[in-house]
């Protein structure tokens, strides 16, 4: 009862703040950037779209132009407003709770999505558009944004995890990359890399839990079960953390990641200088190479993750954004039809690749001609990108995201990785059990 009182008190205060600030879907004064598409068309219906990722607007701008050409009798004027991450999610949740001020369409990041599924979701289900084609998608990505059989969010990418290999280093070490099928093979290859090149096989992040999370998902484990119970200290998770520890201190083929995470400037420079033979991250990390590690162009090769055992899964689905239609829209049919056009159709999934460089969740387009056309990604990584994705498309487990997922991520960065990998004061089992107790105590408050 106390928690509910505090929550609704908080909502009440924040609604007052929003009203005082003029927060409304009809006002873009607080937006970092506002784009209006279709305002030159007489009689166009206005739809308001909120996002926290400016690059996502590019996809919707293109979709509006195409929509208005294809459906001149149902023209759309899209007002796309980009806000800071926390501000957008907080304002959207409060607008939905209060019953007014929400946009027609909105992006919701995967770790925040559970907050919008509490109680009766104030979002409109997209089943009429999703169910006829879901067999053509990586279904696990839709499950992230679903509740009780209703699909509320439309995914933006698969986020398939892969291994990025530096071919130059691997060739110097005499390692055949395609011979690496399991993590045991990976360790043996790493020993050869260290011995023959003096470089490390990989680095282990201490300020980002995603690289470990993808390995956990590969094993069929998770940090929460389907009922929202915390499962941080399972034997599988303990063994994954032990494996990361062993890469550094037992096998001596890895180092702690410079800067703590694969998005740090220190890491970009270290990787760009050719000091690391491989790294595991989702396919969307390709853009980080292009933007921050230009000297590796033509040297990197993408392959499936090594499996934990022969025949095991070789990928995981990490990160994501679900786009929704809110129940406050005055144009339900148009908003849902447009969202399906912009993110579910074949053409839309081709645009996710050509405009954003994302691996589209609709796998049946991956061998379409547009995916074979030369671009910066193929020049950087070679021509096998979608061959790899097609190879692993059925090897991606669903993951369970909770409103407490940010607490898990924070616990890894502040305590678990510090105690196990940096300071080496706790075993993986001790650190994970301690974190389990800490987070469970917070969940019960």
UniProtKB/Swiss-Prot annotation:
What are the protein's UniProt keywords?
Cell membrane, Lipoprotein, Membrane, Palmitate, Signal, Sugar transport, Transport
Q: Which Pfam families match?
A: SBP_bac_1 (PF01547)
Q: What is its main location?
A: membrane
Q: Where in the cell is it found?
A: Cell membrane
Q: How does it sit in the membrane?
A: Lipid-anchor
For this record, an example GO cellular component is:
plasma membrane
Lipid-substituted positions (N-palmitoyl cysteine) = 21
Q: Does the keyword Signal apply?
A: yes
Extract the signal peptide range: 1-20
Q: Where is the lipid attached (S-diacylglycerol cysteine)?
A: 21
Instruction: Outline the subunit composition.
Output: The complex is composed of two ATP-binding proteins (MsmX), two transmembrane proteins (AraP and AraQ) and a solute-binding protein (AraN).
Among PANTHER family, the record links this protein to: ARABINOSE-BINDING PROTEIN-RELATED (PTHR43649), POLYGALACTURONAN_RHAMNOGALACTURONAN-BINDING PROTEIN YTCQ (PTHR43649:SF33)
Q: What does this protein do?
A: Part of the ABC transporter complex AraNPQ involved in the uptake of arabinooligosaccharides. AraN captures the substrate and delivers it to the two transmembrane components.
Q: Which family does the record claim for this protein?
A: Belongs to the bacterial solute-binding protein 1 family.
Name the chain's protein: Arabinooligosaccharide-binding protein
- Species source reads Halalkalibacterium halodurans (strain ATCC BAA-125 / DSM 18197 / FERM 7344 / JCM 9153 / C-125)
């Amino acid at each position: 009862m106390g928690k509910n009182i505090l929550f609704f008190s908080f909502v009440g205060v924040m609604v007052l703040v929003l009203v005082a600030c003029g927060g409304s879907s009809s006002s873009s004064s607080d937006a970092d950037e506002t784009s209006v598409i279709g305002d030159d068309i007489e009689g166009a219906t206005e739809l308001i779209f909120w996002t926290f990722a400016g690059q996502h607007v590019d996809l919707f701008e293109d979709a509006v132009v195409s929509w208005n050409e294809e459906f001149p009798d149902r023209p759309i004027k899209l007002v796309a407003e980009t806000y800071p991450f926390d501000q957008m999610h907080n304002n959207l949740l409060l607008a939905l709770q209060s019953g007014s001020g929400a946009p027609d369409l909105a992006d919701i990041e995967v770790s925040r999505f559970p907050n919008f599924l509490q109680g009766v979701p104030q979002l409109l289900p997209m089943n009429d558009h999703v169910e006829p084609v879901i067999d053509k998608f990586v279904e696990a990505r839709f499950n992230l944004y679903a509740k009780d059989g209703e699909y509320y969010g439309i995914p933006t990418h698969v986020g398939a995890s892969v291994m990025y290999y530096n071919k130059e280093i691997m060739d110097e070490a005499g390692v055949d990359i395609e011979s690496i099928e399991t993590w045991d093979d990976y360790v043996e290859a790493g020993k050869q890399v260290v011995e023959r090149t003096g470089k490390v096989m990989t680095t282990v992040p201490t300020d980002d839990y995603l690289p470990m999370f993808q390995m956990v998902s590969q094993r069929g484990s998770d940090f929460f079960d389907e009922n929202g119970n915390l499962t941080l200290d399972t034997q599988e998770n303990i063994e994954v953390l032990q494996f990361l520890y062993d890469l550094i201190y037992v096998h001596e083929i890895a180092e702690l990641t410079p800067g703590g995470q694969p998005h740090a400037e220190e890491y970009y420079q270290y990787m760009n200088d050719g000091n690391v033979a491989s790294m595991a991250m989702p396919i969307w990390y390709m853009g980080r190479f292009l933007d921050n590690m230009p000297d590796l162009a033509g040297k990197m090769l993408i392959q499936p993750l090594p499996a934990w055992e022969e025949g095991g899964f070789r990928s995981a689905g990490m990160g994501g954004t679900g786009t929704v239609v809110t129940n406050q829209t005055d144009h339900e049919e148009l908003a849902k039809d447009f969202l399906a056009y912009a993110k579910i159709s074949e053409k839309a999934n081709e645009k996710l690749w050509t405009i954003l460089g994302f691996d589209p969740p609709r796998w049946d387009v991956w061998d379409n001609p547009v995916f074979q056309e030369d671009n910066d990604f193929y020049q950087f990584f070679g021509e096998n990108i979608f061959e790899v994705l097609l190879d692993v498309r059925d090897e991606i487990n669903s993951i369970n995201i909770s409103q407490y997922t940010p607490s898990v991520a924070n616990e890894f960065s502040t305590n678990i990785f510090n105690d196990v990998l940096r300071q080496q004061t706790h075993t993986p089992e001790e650190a994970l059990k301690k974190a389990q107790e800490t987070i469970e105590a917070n969940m019960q408050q």
